[in-house]
Amino acid sequence: MINRRDFLQTSALGAGAMALFGTSAYAAELQEADELPSEILSLRSRVEEAPPPISESERDERRERAQSLMDEHGIDALFIEPGASLTYFAGLRWGRSERTFGLLLPRRGDAVVVCPAFERERAAKQVDGRFEIRTWEEDESPFALIGDLMRSWGTGSGRLAFDEATRHFIVHGVSRDAPSLELVSGDPVTHGCRGRRTA
């Protein structure tokens, strides 16, 4: 029996194939009819000129740069929710929901992914062994988990920064469940990294 996800994927692929086939057939008809200007007909594909994908070593350098900026600004850790910054620093693409998911990057050491327990397997496929994954159950607080991780790094009363795209309920939850932390803006770190080109 086909499940909903497989059905949607198959439908999307079929629709995409039909759209491509229809477009290709239409373009061929126009080309045969000499209705396209010569400038259009002379265009060539530039796929081979596309820049290479971001390597993991480059992402390592980005995280190291972030840690250097954290040191400079007295920030002990940076929490990054799903979005452009999570992709930039970790190569992770994750949809947002009401359940907290993100990357906790300490000033020194390796980043940790904070993830709902039921999503662990899916997260592990993307993480691919690059980061430790720490999970929280439905009856537990992800914000307390963030505080616990900070304590395990010896920064239980340190400064925790948030990426500018972090939603209010997460910042509020951490302030409630890990009150010993000082919560600050992560802009000096994220802007300091993302505001400069590395390639």
For the regions a language model picked out, list residue spans one by one.
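Short acidic-hydrophobic, aromatic-tinged amphipathic segments that line or gate anion-handling sites
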Residues: 132-139
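Short internal beta-strands
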Residues: 102-106, 112-116
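Mature N-terminal segment immediately following signal peptide/propeptide cleavage
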Residues: 53-81
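Glycine-rich loop at the start of a catalytic domain that most often binds anionic cofactors/ligands
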Residues: 88-100, 104
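A general structural motif
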Residues: 100, 110, 155-159
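Short, basic, glycine/proline-bearing loop/turn elements
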Residues: 47-54, 131-132
